A protein has these predicted regions:
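An N-terminus-focused feature that recognizes amino-terminal "leader" regions
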Residues: 1-182
Length: 182
């Protein structure tokens, strides 16, 4: 709102530039083999949400099923270390999503699991993964709207919404609690 009015930032398809990374592999999630599914599950479990009071321990089924059953394809970008091509150092996923704003339905891609190896942070990996994924996606699709989830403090990007998450430790709850349903 402050610098650029709401709308599409880039109408033309992007070109490879200094942020494009050749070591990022762009994959349709439907085409992942069992080995890659295990790799991304382990990577997300080890390097996504590394906060003191939060722990995300996904299963392969919980990750892969998140991308099934959509009207369009879901995508994954994997960035490997330049000196050790078997070492995954960054990743990002996108899945199709329909949102309704002011009674207008928009088709977009929701960005999730943007994740960088703990030992590789603060090296500019995330922007390169994002740009390379964006470029590859735009050359495959006409859809040019991407929605990012931002965890932490608000930045210069104007948020669509702001909300709080709450965590509850249910491991010590002594009985099953039921809630009234309408």
């Amino acid at each position: 709102y402050w610098l650029i009015p709401p709308g599409i930032i880039q109408h033309h398809k992007p070109e490879k530039d200094k942020f494009y990374e050749i070591n990022v592999k762009f994959i349709e999630i439907d085409n992942l083999n069992t080995q890659k599914k295990a790799l991304i599950t382990k990577f997300i479990g080890s390097h996504y949400m590394p906060h003191k009071y939060e722990k995300y321990v996904p299963t392969k089924k919980s990750i892969v099923s998140y991308f099934n059953g959509h009207n369009n394809k879901s995508y994954l970008s994997l960035m490997y270390d330049k000196t050790n091509l078997s070492k995954l150092i960054g990743m990002m996923t996108t899945r199709p999503l329909d949102i309704i704003i002011d009674n207008n339905t928009l088709q977009l891609y929701y960005v999730d699991f943007l994740c960088v190896h703990k030992n590789e942070r603060k090296k500019g990996i995330a922007p390169r993964v994002i740009y390379t994924h964006y470029l590859n996606h735009r050359h495959k699709h006409d859809n040019m709207i991407f929605l990012f989830k931002r965890e932490g403090p608000v930045t210069l990007i104007v948020p669509l919404t702001i909300y709080n998450n709450y965590l509850f430790d249910v491991s010590r709850w002594s009985k099953v609690t039921t809630f009234d349903e309408p």
